[in-house]
């Protein structure tokens, strides 16, 4: 359920659930969709035939979000360590 940033196959399928301000300051590509919007309307943002990579600051919010989305039938992975770990590189 977790994946390293280097293992992401399609950066177009990255979903960054941080605030738009955080996303604009530093991002790894993909789309910025707040966690609440993503969980309220996953069918609007996601296709059950695709794989998505959920990222947040530390990896904890993305992991909980990923668990919920996977339970709903979506194929999602949480980016381990989040943006904070990536900034340390």
Annotated model-derived regions:
Residues 12, 30-33, 52, 76-77:
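Hydrophobic anchor at the start of a short beta-strand
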Residues 1-30:
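Flexible, polar/low-complexity N-terminal or interdomain linker segments that lie immediately upstream
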Residues 17-19, 35, 81:
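Active-site loop/turn elements of alpha/beta-hydrolase fold enzymes
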Residues 33-41:
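Glycine-rich, highly charged phosphate/nucleotide-binding loops
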